[in-house]
Amino acid sequence: MRKPLVGINMKNYINTRAQTSEWLEATIPLLGNFSDVDTFIFPSMGTLETTANLLAGTSFGFGPQNMAPEKSGPLTGEFSVESIIDLSANYVEIGHAERKNLFHEKTSEIAKKIQLALDEKITPVVCVGEGIRANDTNELKNALKKQIEALFDTIQVTQFKNVVLAYEPEWAIGKANSADTDYIESAHQALREIIRELGGDETLVRIIYGGSVSKENAAEIVRQKNVDGLFVGRFGHKPQNFADIVSIVSKTKG
């Protein structure tokens, strides 16, 4: 049984230690009754230490929004996995569409980051998703298969279970509406089929949906058989909104 999972990516919206403290201090008490759902936050990078201090001793996971493909070295401006370990972080976001589109991250670099995170026992939340809406399920599966095969080409299939896939269709990120639920379920089902075809155990891999998640669509999305949780964006900037999403997932999947 895959445990439901809800995460939030703060991107560069809540950027000060004071803002992050305020959000966490308001949110943590609201999550006390939802032990059947795992939660995590990717805070603005400059607030990671504040986040680590406030989440110490809780089950609320956290980590950076990116990491270097190497442990250490001449990588100016990157964030080392050694720093992640030092902070006792347990997640790392890898391959977000904005990293690829704005900073031109290559698939080969993303694949190295995934492997490094797995080697260091940190859970990589790997973002995948097509750039434009597919016309049918075959087109959708083919688009996702190209991504998964490239990203996981050198990773042992026995490690797939330690990865979280965040399905985020690029055309739905930051938009007014999410993808429709039939489309979302088709994508999640396709991802499981791809994992199985590569030799992995698709029943062990958690796949969550991100892209214009809100209170209004959360329940319908997580009712889908192959959806294990949600990856929240700006809607979760209000602590009660994030807690409401966790509550919905708990009631629907817990």
From Swiss-Prot:
It catalyses: D-glyceraldehyde 3-phosphate = dihydroxyacetone phosphate. Pathway: Carbohydrate biosynthesis; gluconeogenesis; Carbohydrate degradation; glycolysis; D-glyceraldehyde 3-phosphate from glycerone phosphate: step 1/1. It comes from the Bacteria. The keyword Cytoplasm applies. InterPro entries: Aldolase_TIM (IPR013785), TIM_sf (IPR035990), Triosephosphate_isomerase (IPR000652), Triosephosphate_isomerase_AS (IPR020861). Its EC number is 5.3.1.1. Signal peptide: none annotated. GO terms for biological process: gluconeogenesis; glyceraldehyde-3-phosphate biosynthetic process; glycerol catabolic process; glycolytic process. PANTHER family: TRIOSEPHOSPHATE ISOMERASE. Involved in the gluconeogenesis. Catalyzes stereospecifically the conversion of dihydroxyacetone phosphate (DHAP) to D-glyceraldehyde-3-phosphate (G3P). Homodimer. Belongs to the triosephosphate isomerase family. This is Probable triosephosphate isomerase 2.
